[in-house]
């Protein structure tokens, strides 16, 4: 979205605190109420404004003690019906969030079996992750499930030895392709990761 078109930005800035930037040119930067929408069940609840301040362009609204399940996607809705996806990206600067999502497991990456392959990637600020596997020039996409500690997981049935894969990661309303930082091997151009049968090595 172009900056000129942005009317509202919604972001978690700590574990239980939300910041909403409301464009002054949109209703004078004023909304008497805001709501939190849980996209898993479309439920809507009002959240109370704790404090606010303004800069040259935006009114900044703050909301405290907001309980968020990071396995879900949320929207902030203003009093006029405008909705905006709640971003988690700024939580990389929050020590409490990073401590809560600290993961020291040794099972990240791909784990090959002849009948299936498991995928695990640590990306705690992502809203959604898909794994895209290419076999015989055909690419299939599968949603990954968010587990504890910011780990996303998928188990894909079938034999995918030596197949290429990438992750499609969603932050806010944008998606980006990324290789697996925990993979044992990657393609020659480093554009994709490779599933490896370690029993052959």
Predicted regions and their residues:
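Short, basic/aromatic recognition patches that contact phosphate-bearing ligands
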Residues: 2-13, 25-39
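Structural beta-strand segments of beta-rich domains
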Residues: 16-20, 115-119
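Short proline/glycine-enriched turn/loop motifs at strand-loop junctions of beta-rich domains
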Residues: 22-31, 122-129, 160
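A generic structural motif
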Residues: 37-39, 77, 122, 132-134, ...
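A short, compositionally biased micro-patch
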Residues: 122-126, 136, 147
């Amino acid at each position: 979205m172009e900056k000129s078109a942005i009317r509202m930005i919604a972001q978690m800035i700590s574990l239980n605190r939300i910041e909403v930037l409301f464009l002054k040119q949109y209703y004078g930067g004023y909304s008497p109420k805001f709501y939190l929408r849980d996209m898993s069940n479309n439920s809507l609840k009002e959240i109370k404004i704790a404090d606010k301040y303004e800069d040259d362009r935006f009114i900044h609204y703050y909301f405290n003690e907001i309980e968020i399940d990071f396995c879900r996607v949320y929207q902030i809705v203003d009093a006029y019906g405008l909705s905006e996806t709640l971003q988690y990206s700024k939580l990389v600067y929050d020590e409490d969030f990073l401590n809560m999502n600290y993961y020291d497991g040794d099972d990240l990456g791909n784990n090959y079996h002849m009948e299936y392959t498991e995928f695990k990637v640590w990306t705690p600020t992502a809203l959604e992750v898909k794994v895209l596997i290419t076999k015989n020039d055909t690419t299939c996409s599968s949603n990954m499930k968010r587990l504890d500690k910011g780990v996303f997981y998928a188990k894909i049935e079938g034999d995918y030895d030596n197949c290429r894969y990438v992750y499609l990661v969603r932050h806010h309303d944008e998606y980006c392709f990324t290789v697996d930082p925990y993979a044992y091997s990657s393609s020659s151009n480093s554009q994709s990761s490779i599933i490896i049968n370690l029993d052959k090595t």
